């Protein structure tokens, strides 16, 4: 099996990458260095993770003509944050990311969420009651500004994150440069079968974030299911002499889904890439997919009147009100 997906541009995108969300400064630089040393050639970043300058230091120390790893052999993704959807803000935001990452171009640039927050330099602009200040910028206008970055050679490909099927088609209806990738939450409890099929039919590759169920999130629910303790996955792990995490990553990559598990632990970073030396049988693949229960771990929430509620559900571009 190939260890890469092929984008509609013809460019290869490694099926396994290092996620960097929640990797705090002070630890993320070393994690990226360990990943590159372990054979990773795909790093997923975003300015909202507040660690791009440190990732840039890791790139500076490991990549270059005299460093052993060539820039063109590493696939680097970053994302446009919600406060930067205004067409005038798109290029400056990318240039800041490039400066922080110490790169001349990105392999992939994604619109992080379909909805916009109020313009400015406050990442989460809020009203006095704690609710967020939104903007109604149409993401199709944002997309047109993203397309210009390709023409300028600043990004090799552009794509979407957290968009639903209807929103993808909305972008495709106006795109002169098509999105190549959709990055969404996906794991056995949220298998995204319909959305994956929707993407395939339209030439998009899917990337799965929080592929292990994001066990280190801030807003965990006490009753939520724990993916890594799922008995069906434990049984497969035992059979193949692998960890539950490796079984889950293998399931994703075997169905052609790019997977970006986050870790700052050297042993886990190494373990997560050791998934290309075995193959799940087709009924085992189906067994894992059948664990789907529509469980979304990543729904940004806020507390209103003492209750935890979805933060952005009232926005007209909120993606999770549609079936997929």
Curated annotation (Swiss-Prot):
Pfam families linked: Aldo_ket_red
UniProt-listed CDD domains: AKR_AKR1A1-4
Main location group: cytoplasm
Sorted UniProt keywords: Cell membrane, Cytoplasm, Membrane, NADP, Oxidoreductase
GO molecular function, one term: aldose reductase (NADPH) activity
Subcellular location(s) per record: Cytoplasm, Cytosol; Apical cell membrane
This protein's record includes keyword Membrane: yes
GO cellular component: apical plasma membrane; cytosol
Reactions it catalyzes: a primary alcohol + NADP(+) = an aldehyde + NADPH + H(+); S-nitroso-CoA + NADPH + H(+) = sulfinamide-CoA + NADP(+); S-nitrosoglutathione + NADPH + H(+) = S-(hydroxysulfenamide)glutathione + NADP(+)
Sites annotated Lowers pKa of active site Tyr: 79
Xref: PANTHER family: ALDO/KETO REDUCTASE
Name this polypeptide is given: Aldo-keto reductase family 1 member A1-B
Organism: Danio rerio (Zebrafish)
Gene that encodes it: akr1a1b
């Amino acid at each position: 099996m190939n260890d890469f997906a092929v984008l509609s541009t013809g460019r290869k995108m490694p099926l396994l990458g290092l996620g960097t969300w929640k990797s705090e400064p002070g630890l993320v630089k070393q994690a990226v260095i360990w990943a590159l040393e372990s054979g990773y050639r795909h790093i997923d970043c975003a300015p909202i993770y507040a660690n791009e300058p440190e990732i840039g230091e890791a790139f500076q120390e490991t990549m270059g003509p005299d460093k052993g790893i060539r820039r063109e052999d590493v696939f680097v993704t970053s994302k446009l944050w919600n406060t930067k959807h205004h067409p005038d803000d798109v290029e400056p935001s990318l240039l800041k990311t490039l400066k922080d990452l110490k790169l001349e171009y990105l392999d992939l640039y994604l619109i992080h969420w379909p909805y916009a927050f109020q313009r400015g330099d406050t990442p989460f602009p809020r009203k006095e009651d704690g609710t967020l200040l939104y903007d109604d910028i149409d993401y199709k206008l944002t997309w047109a500004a993203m397309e210009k970055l390709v023409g300028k050679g600043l990004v090799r490909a552009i794509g979407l994150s957290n968009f639903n099927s209807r929103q993808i088609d909305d972008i495709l209806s106006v795109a002169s440069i098509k999105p190549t990738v959709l990055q969404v939450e996906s794991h056995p409890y949220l298998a995204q079968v319909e959305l994956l099929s929707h993407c395939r039919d339209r030439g998009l590759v899917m990337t799965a974030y929080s592929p292990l169920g994001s066990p280190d999130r801030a807003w965990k629910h006490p009753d939520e299911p724990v993916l890594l303790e799922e008995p069906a996955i434990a049984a497969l792990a035992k059979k193949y002499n692998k960890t539950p995490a490796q079984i889950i990553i293998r399931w994703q990559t075997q169905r052609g889904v790019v997977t970006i598990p986050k870790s700052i632990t050297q042993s886990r970073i190494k373990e997560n890439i050791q998934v290309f030396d075995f193959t799940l049988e087709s009924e085992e693949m189906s067994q894992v997919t059948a664990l789907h229960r529509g469980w979304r771990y990543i729904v940004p929430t806020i507390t209103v009147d003492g209750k935890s509620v979805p933060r952005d559900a009232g926005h007209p571009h909120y993606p999770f009100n549609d079936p997929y």
